[in-house]
Amino acid sequence: MEKRPLQTSNAANIPSKTIEEMYQKKTQLEHILLRPDTYVGSIEKHTQNLWVYENDEMVHRAVSYVPGLYKIFDEILVNAADNKQRDPSMDSLKVTIDPEANTVSVYNNGDGVPVEIHQEEKVYVPELIFGHLLTSSNYDDNVKKTTGGRNGYGAKLTNIFSTEFIIETADGRRLKKYKQVFSNNMGTKCEPVITKCKASENWTKVTFKPDLEKFKMAYLEEDVVALMKKRVLDMAGCFGKTVKVELNGTLIRFKSFRDYADLFLKCAEKSKPMPLPRIHAKVGDRWEICISLSDGQFQQVSFVNSIATIKGGTHVDYITNQITTYIMNKVNKKKKDANVKAHTVKNHLWVFVNSLIDNPAFDSQTKETLTTRQASFGSKCDVPESMLKDVEKSGIVDTLLSWADFKQSKDLKKTDGTKTQRLRGCKAEDANEAGGRNSEKCTLILTEGDSAKALAMAGLSVVGRDHYGVFPLRGKLLNVREASSKQIMDNEEIQNIKKILGLQQNKEYTNVKSLRYGHLMIMADQDHDGSHIKGLLINFIHSFWPSLLKVPSFLVEFTTPVIRASHPNKTITSFYSMPEYEAWKERLGNSATSWKIKYYKGLGTSTPQEGREYFSDLGRHRKDFIWDDELDGNAIELAFSKKKAEGRKIWMRNFEPGTCRDHEAKLINYKDFVNKELILFSRADLFGSFKKKLYKEIKVAQFIGYVSEHSAYHHGEQSLASTIIGMAQDFVGSNNINLLKPNGQFGTCNLGGKDHASARYIYTELSPVTRCLFHEHDDKLLEYLNEDGKSIEPNWYMPIIPLVLVNGSEGIGTGWSSYIPNYNPREIIANVRRLLNGEELVPMDPWYKGFRGTIEKSAKEGGYIVNGTVTEIDEQTFRITELPIRKWTQDYKQFLESITDGAPNVKDPLIEDFRQNGDDAIVDIEIKMKPEKIATILQEGLFKKFKLTSTISTSNMHLFDAEGNKKFDTPEQILEEFFPLRLDYYEKSKEYILGNLNRLLLILDNKVRFILGVVNGEIIVSNRKKAELLIELKEKGFTPMPRKGKSTKPQVAGANDDDSEEQEDAEPETASQSVSVEGATWGDYDDLLSLPIGTLTLESVQKLLDEKTEKEKEYEILSGTPTTSLWLKDLDEFEKKLDELDLKYAEDDRKRASQGSKKANGFASKPAKKPPQPRKNTKKAKSVEPENDNSSMEIENAVEAAKPAEVAKPKGRAAPKKNIQKEPEDDIQSLQERLAAYNIESSGEKSQAMESEEVQQKAAGKKQNNKRGGAKKKSSTIVLESDSDNEVNDVDDDDDDFEEVQQKAAPVKKGGRKPAAQNAKKAPAKAPAKAPAAPKKRSVGTKQSAGQKLLTDMLQPAEGTGTSPEKKVRKMRESPFNKKSGSILGRAAAAKDISPIADCSAGSASNTPLSEDEVVEIAPQPARARPQRANRTQMKYALSESESEEDSDEDAELSDFEEDDD
C-alpha cells in the first residue's frame, strides 16, 4: 500500500481496506504462529549472560539464542519430568540432541500415555494430548499436583513449531505400542500405527525437528545446543540419584542437588582466592536448598516441579528472606552502627532451590517466575537453625561488616575538612594564622563547655590570638568506636572538629603540614568527667587517624590545679591531684590549719585573673601526650572498644585504689593515661533520707534539692527524681521492699512506673522498715567519700541483709552488664540465721512481692521460667489474672489489640474481642477467642501464643563487692560474700557503742563528783580565774573529756543535730575561750563548767547516780552479748516490720476488694469471678513506726512501749481494736520532763486521771460512730503533738502534727461534761485482756479522715456546744493556725485524697498520756445547709498562767477561712 508523502501511517492515511481485510478471525493454530511471543516467548535472537554446559563444565558467558526455540525444547523435557510425579517408578530419562540432523528426542520410562480412544473426542489419547490444543490432565484445580504442566499448551507448542513431530508410547497395561507422525507445524498428521507390546513395556518418546525458519535460524547453533545440554543437567540435578539421566548416550552422575550446585561453584571459584562455602539442607520431601556466597549481586538457580525459574519467584523469596533476616540481625547486633538491611544481605548470597509446589502459577507461559503465594505452596520450609548458623559462619558476616565500614567511610568523607585560611559557619575562635603558612605553630584549645572557653579567652590575652584558637565542647564527645555512621554524621561537634583542624577521613598523617592546626590542646576539668572527655577525644583521633597520635606534640593537655592553698604571708601552693594535696597536708601536720584551702571543682571556678596566671606559665600547665609503642593503642582500645569487654573486666578488677598518674611529669604516654587516670571512676539518695531524718513526708522535688546539696550529686535533677521515685515504687515487679513511702502517684504496673506523677506533686518519706535495714550505729563506721573537702555519702552502705537480693539490680556499667532478680527477704533472713548458726544454706529462687504467677526452674543452668495466670471460663473465653514479671498491662493491651479481629493491619487475628476488668494494681483481662483458632492455640500452647511466659537468668550477676567487681553464680554466693563483712561491722558497732557508754559513764562520774564538790563547798566556781579552776579540777582527778572536734563525717540521722551546717560556719574559739594550763584546756571540762545552776542540787546528783547505774547495767549486758546475738535481734526486729507491712498490704487489698465497683459483664455466661484475694501473710503484726534509740536492745524495748495502750471497755459492745501509731521523733521527753520544763505543777494522780478520761472518750467515740442514725452529731478533738525542743522545722510545715481522737458527743441540752478526774473514777482502766473487736457497720475504706471531720465541725455554729470550757486547752507552743501552709481547711480538703498507704500508716491518736496543755477541742455544732461568714467557728484556747488575755483572743479570732491557700 502506498502512503501519502510526509504523512503518518494511521488508518486515515492508508488507502481504505475492506471490512473483511480489516477485521479477521484466526484459528488458534494460526494465532500461535502469528503471535508466537504470547506462547513461547520471543522468536528473535537475544544475547544474554547465561550459564551453559560445555566441555563437561558449567560456564557463565554471553549466549546468543532464540528464547522461543529454547522453550519448545523445555516443554518436552518438563513433560518427561512430570511423569516422575505421576509414576515414582520412573528411573530413566534419555535426551539426544543432533545438531546436524536438526533432531531432538526425549525418552522416559514409566507409565506411558494410555493407548485408548477418548470416548468424547473420538481420537486416541496420545493424539489428543500431543496434537490438539487446550488438552491437559491438569485442569482439575481441586486436585493438588506437583507437575509442570498447567495450561494445555506444552508439547502442542513444540509440535506447532516443528517441521516434524513424532510421538511414540508403549502402554504395557493395554499391551499396545503407539506411533504417530505430525508435520507441517501440526497442520498434517498421519494415521497412528498401533502394534503389540509386552506388559513390561512402559515408556514414552518424543522426537521433533524444530522449524528453524520460524526462528530465523539455518541450523541448531552452538549456543542453543549448549543451553539445551545445560537444561538436561538441570533435570539430573533435580532428580538426583532417583533417575538416571543420559545426554547423547552419556550418563550424568549426580547424587544430590548439592552435586549439581557444585558445578556452578567450581566455575565461580576459578576467580576466587578461597573456595566458596557449600551449605546444603533437605527439608522434607519437597525442598532442597544449597547456599553459597556471591560478589555483591544476588544470584539464584531455582526449580519448581523441574521447571527452571530463571528469574526466581516467591519460592526463592521464601527461602532467601529467612536467611537474610537472620544474618541481618546478627550483623546489626555485632555492630550496632552497621545498619545493614535485608536487601544488602541478599546481594551477598547465592541461593539454589529445588522445590515441588502444588498447582504452580507463573507470570507467563514462559514460566520464568513463580507467582504462587507462600500459603498455597502445599508445604512449609523452615530453614534449619543449623543451616542458618553455618551461613553465619561462612564469612558473610565479616563481608557485610567490611561493606558497612566502607560505606560509612565513604559517607564520612563528605564531611572532610580542608586547609583553608578562612573558616565559616562554626562556633570557634579561630587563630589568625590557622590554615596559613604558620599553621604548624597554631594550637586549637578544646574546652569543656562555654565557661571553660571564657577562662581560655582570658588566657589568650597573655599568649595572643595569632597562634591560639578556642572551640568549646558541649558535654562529652561521642564514642565514635561504638557509634553508627549516622550518629557520627549527625554529630555537630565531630564535624566541627574535622572542619577546624582540616581532617580528612582515614588519611594517613606523618606530619601536620596539611592541617589547619599543628597542635590540639584539651582543656577539661580535673575530675573524672574531665578525664573521660580527654579519653573520648583520644579515642576519636585513634579511631580514624591513629597516625596523628604518633606525631610528636600533636595532642597536648592543659592542666589546672584542683586545690590551691594560700597562706597569710601571700604564699600560694597549687595541687593538681588529691593524693598530692593529702601528702602535703600530712607533712605540715597541725600547721596546715593556718592555710586557706580553695577547691576547684571545674574550670569555671577559676577567675579570669587566675586564667591569665595559668597562661603566663604555660610550660607548667602544658603536658604533651607521647606514643611509645602499640601498647598505647591497645590501651585506648581496651577502654573504649566493645570487642574488648572481657579484657576491660580484667583491667577493672586489677585496679588498686589510690592509683594516679604523676602530675609533675611533662610527658604522658597514652597507656599511663588510660591505666592511671581514665580508670578512676566514681557513685546518693538513701544518705539524704537518713541525714534529713525523713520521718515526715516531703515533696519529692524538695527532697531532690536536699540530696543534691548534701551528697554533691552532679548528674541532673531528672536522674535523681527517677531514682527517688524508683526507691518508693511498690507495685508488682518493682521493689520487694521500698525504702521510701510512695505518698502519691508513683507509678503502677500499667506502665511499669512510667505513669508516675511529676516530682512537684508527689511526696515521700522514709519507710518504717528502712532504718531496720540500715542501722544507725553503722553510720559512724562507714567510709565516707569526699567532695571539694566536704564529706558526703558513704562509699557503700552495710544493711543487715544484702539489699541487692531483696530488690534486684539491672544495669550496664564500665565493662559489665548485670542482672539480679528479686528474692524473698524472709528466705534471705532465714539463710542469714543459718550462717549465724553454722548450718547449710538453702537454695533461693527468685520471688516478687504480690506476684500471683509461677516461677519455675528451667532446663538451662541458672534459668527460670516465669508464667502468668490464665483460667478457662468456657470453651471460648479465658481470663488472664497475672502477667509475667515486668510485662506491663498497657503494653499487653497493645499486644492483644494486634491480634484482635477488626483491628487495623491485623493479618491473622486470634481473638474476637477482649475486656479489661482490672485496675491500677490488679490484672483481670477476659479474652474471647475465635472458634476456628482455639484448636491451633491450644496445640501450640496458650501461654506461648498469648505471651504469658518469660524467662529469668542468674548467669549475669556482676556486683561490686568490698574490693571491687566480682561475678556471682548463685544468690547464695552473694550471701556468703556478704556475711563475714557484715559480721565484722557488728563487731565494730559493738565496740563503738561500748566506747560511747564508757565515755558517758566517765562524764556522769565527773558530774556527780563536781556537783557534790560545789554543794559541799569543796569547789568554788564563782569569782575565780579560769586557769586556777582548770588546775584545781586537774589536781582533784577529774578526767578531762575533750570536746569532739568538728567531724568530717556527714551529719546522719541521730548522729548530730540538724543545725550542723550552722556549727560548721561558727566562729572559731576566741583566746579567752581557749585557755590552756598544763595540757588541759577549758574545753576538756566543758561538760562540767557549762552545767546550769539549777542542776547543782542533791536531787540532780541522785538522778545522775540513777542514770549511771542504768548505763553500767546496759554496758554489762552489751559487753556480755555475743555479736551474733546482736545480728539475730536486728533480724527479729526487721521481720516484725515485715509482718507489719504484710498486714498493711493485706488490709489495702481487702479495702480495694470491698471498695471496688461492680465489674462489667464478661463474655462468658458464668458468674463473675471473685475479687483477687489479699496477699498471703506469714504472720500478723501491729504497725509500729521506727524509733531513733541508741541500741538494738533499746529498739526492742521501744517496740514493746509503742504497743497500743489498754482501753477501758465501756458497757455494751466492745469498741473495735485500733492500731495507734506514734510519730517517730528523736529523744522524746517524758510528760514529767515537759511539765518541768514549763514549770507547771503536775501530779501522778492528775496525769492518770486525764489519761483515763482520754481512753474512755476514745472508746465512747468509737461506740457511737458504729451506730446508725442522725440524731447525734460526732465531735472531734485535735491533738497537737509537741516537737522536740531542738527540732528544726521541716519543709512540710509540720502537717503531720494533727491527729484525730474520737470522743463521745455531749448532749446538746445539758451543760458541760464533768471534769476528767470524775470521769476517770467512773471508768477505771481494766486488765490487759484481749477483747474481740466489734465489727464496723460501714464499709471498708469509708473511714473519715481527721481533716474531713474538722471541716464538718467547723461549718457548724458556735452556740450551744455543751462543751465544758475546762476541756479547751492550748498547747504550749506557737499556734500552728498562723502558718499559711497549715490551714485546717486546706488539710481537711487534702485529707479527702489521702492515699491508702498514708491512711494505713497514720494512727487515730497518740498513745502517750496527754496533759491538759496538749488538747484542743472543737465543739460540735448543729448542721446548717450554707453557713454564713458571721457564724463561722472560732478557735478558743485556755490560757496558761504565763500568757496574756490579749494574745489568746488575737490567736482565737484567726479563722481558717482567712488563711492563704497554698
Curated annotation (Swiss-Prot):
Essential cofactor(s): Mg(2+); Mn(2+); Ca(2+)
Positions of Mg(2+) 1 binding: 448, 525
UniProt domain Topo IIA-type catalytic: residue ranges: 671-1131
Binding site for ATP: 79, 108, 136-138, 149-156, 365-367
Induction notes from the record: By light and growth factors.
UniProt feature, compositional bias: Low complexity: 1198-1207, 1314-1334, 1419-1430
Record's keyword annotation contains Isomerase: yes
Biased composition (Basic residues): 1167-1181, 1260-1275
Polar residues bias: start-end ranges: 1240-1250
One GO location term (cellular component): nucleus
Tissue expression pattern: Abundant in proliferative tissues.
Reaction(s) catalysed by this chain's protein: ATP-dependent breakage, passage and rejoining of double-stranded DNA
PANTHER family from the UniProt entry: DNA TOPOISOMERASE 2, DNA TOPOISOMERASE/GYRASE
Protein name: DNA topoisomerase 2
Species annotation: Pisum sativum
